[in-house]
């Protein structure tokens, strides 16, 4: 005889199911469950008197020798991913996602996708949201505290460059030369996050870049502060093509070595990741945004201008002066900074993100952006755009799935594809490393509840360790066991070039982390950017007013005075 529950009571016990909507934080965005892989009446729920007990939902006979037995089950999770918004159990084994569906005991339950046994830990995610760990492709390695601050907002992978607070690193995301690349690879070996390093892309000979790729760099970055010249770009792209690594560029704001059209010519149709495609962080003034319409360009922008608020413009000038080693006493330096701060392109940036023309959200950490705000600002922007532009096509009341999937892709799968690491991370899919972030819906986008790295709890909200329970205050994000000892080496990845991987870079310089090669970076186009592949036919920036036109229509939006995910969640 069946037992009936109303939807509200069911959601309280087992989490939302098909057709139910979940509000994301204090935004006006609602995620609607598209498919539920659990079975009503046979949900795998942990706890006293619940299903996951010996001989019931837990197999009494299966050992870990059975490859279907998982190390961890995440039960009843609401998964938000570019692939869909679903309800399912997640099975993790050997640090990877091995199943998304229904976990339990095949002796007592029908149609089980993976087995819960004596070897299995349980994380109860009924009513919670699970996303892939965030990937920030634009990090200045200035402070060694960056990984922890990133984890505080769900960022588990950092790509960028630097050597600490050297002026070159304060300004550019390049780790120059074999010495610095080697020492930085060794420096992050005990840090609980995934890392990749970008070589300095300069020079009129390919050898000066090539030696850095052989030393273990996972990509190349050309930056105007080191010189974004035609020859430097062309030679860097030749090396990128030869070794299958990504190429990123921060173009010439001063238009000294050439204009936007000259830089575009230097690309010669080759795949390029453009940083600061809006322009306030740097790049051809005032028309770098034209790059967002080119098929061979994978465009990203940075979080200090997202979303466009009444205070956004005010902080940019000082940030430019500090980051790029400019002198406020020199008029030319001030003019250089002022040329980059254009409210018209900042306003258009929001809209281009919402249209899917800007494909990736990054931080520009410590050099005009904040590593701990990538995820938060992405959802603030999505919320602002819904309020100003209305639902996306296919969305409806209490169902913003199309917009939600577009925005989650900006900091998960698209950066993974761009830098050649999508086979390993970037989405909640079977076969990928279990770099997962678990959120309470009310805190979504602001503060994670738990962060898993390689299937192990590494960061999370935790109370006073001297108390009788895990819940007493102060409940703050703290390092968990996955952030210590040899566990760090078994659950985190250092990404290098295929050449360095094949030639034993791990053994050569004594790395302990998992070392993996980047791949499949050189034949990408805008069409490979999931749910963010719109390439407008024409983007035009008026050189006098800086107004932005797409296909001859003005693109702009108003700044907002307050944002979601802000003072309700943070004191400062």
UniProtKB/Swiss-Prot annotation:
A Gene Ontology cellular-component term: cytoplasm
Post-translational modification: Carboxylation allows a single lysine to coordinate two nickel ions.
Subcellular location: Cytoplasm
Entry EC number(s): 3.5.1.5
PROSITE patterns found in the cross-reference section: UREASE_1, UREASE_2, UREASE_3
Chief location bin: cytoplasm
InterPro entries named in the record: Amidohydro-rel, Metal-dep_hydrolase_composite, Metal_Hydrolase, Urease_alpha_N_dom, Urease_alpha_subunit, Urease_AS, Urease_asu, Urease_asu_c
Pfam families tied to this protein: Amidohydro_1, Urease_alpha
Pathway linked to the protein: Nitrogen metabolism; urea degradation; CO(2) and NH(3) from urea (urease route): step 1/1
Names of the cofactor(s): Ni cation
Enzyme class: hydrolase
Cofactor note as given: Binds 2 nickel ions per subunit.
Binding site for substrate: 223
Gene Ontology MF annotations: nickel cation binding; urease activity
Keywords: Cytoplasm, Hydrolase, Metal-binding, Nickel
Catalytic residues, chain numbering: 324
Domain Urease positions: 133-572
Residues reported to bind Ni(2+) 2: 221, 250, 276
Protein family membership: Belongs to the metallo-dependent hydrolases superfamily. Urease alpha subunit family.
Protein name per the record: Urease subunit alpha
Gene assigned in the entry: ureC
């Amino acid at each position: 005889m069946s037992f009936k529950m109303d939807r509200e009571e069911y959601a309280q016990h087992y989490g939302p199911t098909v057709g139910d909507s979940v509000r994301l934080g204090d935004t006006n965005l609602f995620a609607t469950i598209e498919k539920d892989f659990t079975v009503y009446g046979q949900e795998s729920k942990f706890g006293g008197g619940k299903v996951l007990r010996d001989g019931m939902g837990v197999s009494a006979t299966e050992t870990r020798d059975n490859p279907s037995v998982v190390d961890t089950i995440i039960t009843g999770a609401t998964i938000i991913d570019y692939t869909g918004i679903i309800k399912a159990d997640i099975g993790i084994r050997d640090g990877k996602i091995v199943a998304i569906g229904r976990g339990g005991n095949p002796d007592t339950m029908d149609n089980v996708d993976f087995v819960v046994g004596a070897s299995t830990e349980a994380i109860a995610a009924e009513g919670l949201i699970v996303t892939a760990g965030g990937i920030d492709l634009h990090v200045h390695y200035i402070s060694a505290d960056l990984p922890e601050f990133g984890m505080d907002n769900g960022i588990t992978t950092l790509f960028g460059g630097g050597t600490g607070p050297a002026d070159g690193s304060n300004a550019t995301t390049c780790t120059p030369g074999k010495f610095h690349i080697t020492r930085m690879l060794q420096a992050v070996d005990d840090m609980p996050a995934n890392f990749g390093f970008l070589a300095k892309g300069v020079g009129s000979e390919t050898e000066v870049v090539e030696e850095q790729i052989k030393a273990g760099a996972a990509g190349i970055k050309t930056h105007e502060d080191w010189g974004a010249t035609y020859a430097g770009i062309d030679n860097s792209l030749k090396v990128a093509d030869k070794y299958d690594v990504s190429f990123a560029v921060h173009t010439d704001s001063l238009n000294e070595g050439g204009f936007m059209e000259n830089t575009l010519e230097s690309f010669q149709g080759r795949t390029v990741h453009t940083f600061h495609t809006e322009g306030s962080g740097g790049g051809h003034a005032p028309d770098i945004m034209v790059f967002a319409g080119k098929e061979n360009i994978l465009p990203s922008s940075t979080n200090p201008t997202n979303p466009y608020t009444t205070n956004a413009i005010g902080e940019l000038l000082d940030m430019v002066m500090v980051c790029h080693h400019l002198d406020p006493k020199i008029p030319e330096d001030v003019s250089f900074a002022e040329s980059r701060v254009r409210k018209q392109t900042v306003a258009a940036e929001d809209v281009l993100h919402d249209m899917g023309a800007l494909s990736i959200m990054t931080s520009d950490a410590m050099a005009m952006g904040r590593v701990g705000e990538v995820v938060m600002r992405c959802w603030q922007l999505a919320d602002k755009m819904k309020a100003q532009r209305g639902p996306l096509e296919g969305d409806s009341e209490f169902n913003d799935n199309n917009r939600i999937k577009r925005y989650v892709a900006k900091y998960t799968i698209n950066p993974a594809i761009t830098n050649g690491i999508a086979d390993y991370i970037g989405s909640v899919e079977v076969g990928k490393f279990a770099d997962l972030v678990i959120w309470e819906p009310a805190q979504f986008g602001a503060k994670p509840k738990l962060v898993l790295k390689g299937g192990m709890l590494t960061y999370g909200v935790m109370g006073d360790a001297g108390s009788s329970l895990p819940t007493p205050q102060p409940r703050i994000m703290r390092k968990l066991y996955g952030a210590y000892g040899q566990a760090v080496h078994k659950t985190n990845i250092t990404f290098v070039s295929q050449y360095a991987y094949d030639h034993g870079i791990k053994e050569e310089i004594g790395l302990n982390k998992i070392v993996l090669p980047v791949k499949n970076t050189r034949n990408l186009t805008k069409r490979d950017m999931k749910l963010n592949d719109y390439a407008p036919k024409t983007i035009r920036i008026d050189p006098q007013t800086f107004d932005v036109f797409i296909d001859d229509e003005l693109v702009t939006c108003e700044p907002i005075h307050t944002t979601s995910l802000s003072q309700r969640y943070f004191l400062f």
